[in-house]
Amino acid sequence: MAKFLKYGRVVILLQGRFAGKKAVIVKSSEDGTKDRKFGHVLVAGVERSPKKVTKRMGSKKIQKRTSVKPFIKYVNLNHIMPTRYSVKELCDFKELVKEDKIKNNAKSEVRDTLKKVFVEKYRTINPEEKSASHTKFFFSKLRF
């Protein structure tokens, strides 16, 4: 059977604190590892998505409303739902989110760098690009 939970795939988390939030697969381990003996993925996602901005808003308000709060988490394969979207071009997640950094309690530093990258990418979405709809979907709030 083909593996479809690959790097860059957008997934929706189904269980836990971040249930209903969108995330991107950074690393997939379908057979498990020594630490986690079950199939799991390392995801980087958006905990708080940016809000709508209008022309009448000032620059400070726009800065505040376009902020993104990211998260990093290991998730069991049973607790994710893959989508048809893929955002490999968003940034190089493998360089930003490394497992040794997460294990060495540098998770907050990784989260800060992710926040900077996510905010910068969100503010510079080009609607003419082919992958713009994928990026727009990733940063939008899931309505249900």
From Swiss-Prot:
Keywords: Cytoplasm, Ribonucleoprotein, Ribosomal protein. GO terms for cellular component: cytoplasm; ribonucleoprotein complex; ribosome. This is Large ribosomal subunit protein eL27. InterPro entries: Ribosomal_eL27, Ribosomal_eL27_KOW, Ribosomal_eL27_sf, Translation_prot_SH3-like_sf. Pfam families: Ribosomal_L27e (PF01777). One of its GO terms (molecular function) is structural constituent of ribosome. It comes from the Eukaryota. The lineage of its organism: Eukaryota, Sar, Alveolata, Ciliophora, Intramacronucleata. One of its GO terms (biological process) is translation. Belongs to the eukaryotic ribosomal protein eL27 family. It is found in: Cytoplasm. SUPFAM superfamilies: Translation proteins SH3-like domain. Gene3D superfamilies: 2.30.30.770. Its main location: cytoplasm.
